[in-house]
Amino acid sequence: MNIAEFHQNIEQVWQKIEEELENQGADVDCETQGSVFTITFDNRTQIVINKQEPLLELWIASKLGGFHFAFKNGDWVSNDGQRFWDCFVEACAAHGENVQF
């Protein structure tokens, strides 16, 4: 994957998150600043998702900790094989919002 494809893939992830959270009625605010996408929950906790361009990775930080994902076979996957979307759903639940992706 080249840099342009990387950014396009990340933008698609961020757009899907924002659209699905809105469609599912989640009480959150989403904000993008440069390479950082922040989701603030009603209880004022946050999930931060950011682009790591030099590594071509997607990173997520939440109450559950920090996780790194690389794009493999059409999906964002961590070194231990966890899918980004599964991690994101678990993180949202830890922050008080039950969502499905």
From Swiss-Prot:
GO cellular component: cytosol
Name of protein: Iron-sulfur cluster assembly protein CyaY
Species per Swiss-Prot/TrEMBL record: Haemophilus influenzae (strain ATCC 51907 / DSM 11121 / KW20 / Rd)
Keyword Metal-binding (UniProt): yes
Keywords tagged on the record: Iron, Metal-binding
Family from the record: Belongs to the frataxin family.
InterPro entries: CyaY, Frataxin/CyaY, Frataxin/CyaY_sf, Frataxin_CS
Gene3D superfamilies given in the database record: Frataxin/CyaY
Origin organism lineage: Bacteria, Pseudomonadati, Pseudomonadota, Gammaproteobacteria, Pasteurellales
Pfam family for this entry, one: Frataxin_Cyay
Function, in words: Involved in iron-sulfur (Fe-S) cluster assembly. May act as a regulator of Fe-S biogenesis.
Gene that encodes it: cyaY
Keyword tRNA-binding set for record: no
GO biological process, any: iron-sulfur cluster assembly
Top-level taxon of origin: Bacteria
GO molecular function terms noted in the UniProt entry: ferric iron binding; ferrous iron binding
SMART domains: Frataxin_Cyay
